[in-house]
Amino acid sequence: RLSNIKLGDTVVFVNKDAEQHWPASDIHPTHGVYPEKGGCIGSKFDACKGLKEGKQYSFTFFHKGSWCYHDHLKPNLVGCVDAQ
């Protein structure tokens, strides 16, 4: 899924599933594509843990580009955020 946002917008990832999900910057497993460092594995765009049902993770995009992400626990679940 591609979401179009403006720089400085915050995207909220909400787990609506009974299974845990862990949103993180591509690429799996290093999460290093988003250029801002400081997360638990690679980039700052990383929830750093699985989110239980009803829990959420928010991330504010300050770098222009198309930033793809995946679920670290189920890497076949993917999406992209286009920040302009």
Put a short name on every predicted segment.
Residues 1-84:
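Extracytoplasmic copper-binding redox domains, predominantly the cupredoxin/blue-copper superfamily
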